Amino acid sequence: MELYLDTANVAEVERLARIYPLAGVTTNPSIIAAGKVPVWDVLPRLQKAVGPEGTLFAQTMSRDAQGMVEEAKRLSNAVPGIVVKIPVTAEGLAAIKLLKKEGIPTLGTAVYSASQGLLAALAGAKYVAPYVNRVDAQGGDGIRMVQELQSLLEMHAPESKVLAASFKTPRQALDCLLAGCEAITLPLDVAQQMLGTPAVESAIEKFEQDWNNAFGALNL
């Protein structure tokens, strides 16, 4: 199972990489734009933050296949090993096929249906990213869509992985993992909610109080 952070905040990646078993970091144009640091400056810093074993994801901006391929090559040259995110449109599918031949790994992004995700995988995408909460927000069932996509990939494109994205709660992420997803990417707030249960602190404080009352110290 691969756990990613969905952010371009270098300081937060450095902080959480010490704590979480991270596989890397995913970004998108909106995330990069929010940080107001040019993509060619922030990507090397993020790569350093996740370490040599971490994987970095960044997205193209062109709308046509040839432009996507050219941008993907620039990204791959700037950050060796990067996985290039390609929106799963008609032109995006064409770009994924071309990049597969070039040996540049891709992630099919902006996936709102299982059929769309399957096409990306069949075209050669290494990862497929269904948007769980965004599907829910449109009146759909994001978890069910992920379940269907996971089953389809297992049957027809086992070399591709579902990398589920767009979460508002830890429960959504856990449901995707229970559906068999091999990878998820979490925004910072959801990642921290996974450890931020008030009951945990209450339990620790009770342990400390009992220990201190018995031994007059808070160490072994």
From Swiss-Prot:
Q: What GO MF annotations does this protein's record show?
A: fructose 6-phosphate aldolase activity
Report the leader peptide range.
Answer: none
| InterPro entries (UniProt xref) | Aldolase_TIM, F6P_aldolase, TAL/FSA, Transaldolase_3B/F6P_aldolase, Transaldolase_AS, TSA/FSA_arc/bac
| UniProt subcellular location | Cytoplasm
Residues annotated as the enzyme's active site: K85 (schiff-base intermediate with substrate)
Q: Which Pfam families match?
A: TAL_FSA (PF00923)
Keywords of the record, alphabetical order, are: Carbohydrate metabolism, Cytoplasm, Lyase, Schiff base
Q: Which GO terms describe its biological process?
A: fructose metabolic process
Q: Under which EC number(s) is this enzyme classified? A: 4.1.2.-
User: What positions belong to coiled-coil segments?
Assistant: none
According to its record, what are the GO cellular component terms?
A: cytoplasm
Matching entries from SUPFAM superfamilies are given as: Aldolase
* Chemical reaction(s) catalysed: beta-D-fructose 6-phosphate = dihydroxyacetone + D-glyceraldehyde 3-phosphate
- Keyword Cytoplasm appears in the UniProt entry: yes
- The protein's role, per its UniProt record: Catalyzes the reversible formation of fructose 6-phosphate from dihydroxyacetone and D-glyceraldehyde 3-phosphate via an aldolization reaction.
Subunit structure and binding partners? Homodecamer.
Assigned protein family: Belongs to the transaldolase family. Type 3A subfamily.
This protein is called Fructose-6-phosphate aldolase
List the source organism.
Answer: Klebsiella pneumoniae subsp. pneumoniae (strain ATCC 700721 / MGH 78578)
